[in-house]
C-alpha cells in the first residue's frame, strides 16, 4: 500500500493559490483516474490501484500547518510505512515549472512538511516539490504563497501538474529511483 498526500489549505478562497499546488496535483490525478474524494482521517481520501498495489490519495483538511496529523492518521490506520508515503507540496526555492523528487530531507522551512515530519517521527518519506518560484521585490512570502497563479503562469502550471502526475504514478508503480531519474531534470 502507498499514500500520496497533496498539501494545501481547504476552502474556496485558497483553491487556486500557489500554496495549494499539492491539492491541485491530486485533483488532476483524481480527475484523470475518475476518482471521487470522501471525508476521512481529517482529510479527503480517494483510493485506486497502481501497479497492482492499493494507493490512497489524501488531501488533508487541517490547514497546511497541521497536515501531518491527517497523513499520520491514514498511514497508521492502513499500516503504511513512511517509505511508502509521497507528499506533494509547493516549493518557493524551485522556479515555477520545475519538479524535484526526494526520498527524504528536512522541512526546508515548509510548515506542512514540518508537521508531517513531527507526526511521522521521521524525515524519511518521499516528497514531490512543485516549484512556485520566489516572490518579486515588495511581496511578502506569506502573501505570495496565498495568492493565485497569474494568467501567465497558468500554462506552465498545467504542464508541471501533468509531469507531476506522471512522476507520482511512476513512483507508485515502479519506485522512486526510476521516477527521480526521469523527473529530476
Swiss-Prot record:
InterPro entries reported for this sequence: Pept_tRNA_hydro, Pept_tRNA_hydro_CS, Pept_tRNA_hydro_sf
Biological-process GO terms, alphabetical: protein quality control for misfolded or incompletely synthesized proteins; rescue of stalled ribosome
Residues under site feature: Stabilizes the basic form of H active site to accept a proton: 90
Entry annotation: catalytic residues: 19 (proton acceptor)
Identification of the protein by name: Peptidyl-tRNA hydrolase
Site feature: Discriminates between blocked and unblocked aminoacyl-tRNA: 9
Lineage: Bacteria, Bacillati, Bacillota, Clostridia, Eubacteriales
Alphabetical keyword list: Cytoplasm, Hydrolase, RNA-binding, tRNA-binding
EC number: 3.1.1.29
Binding site for tRNA: 14, 63, 65, 111
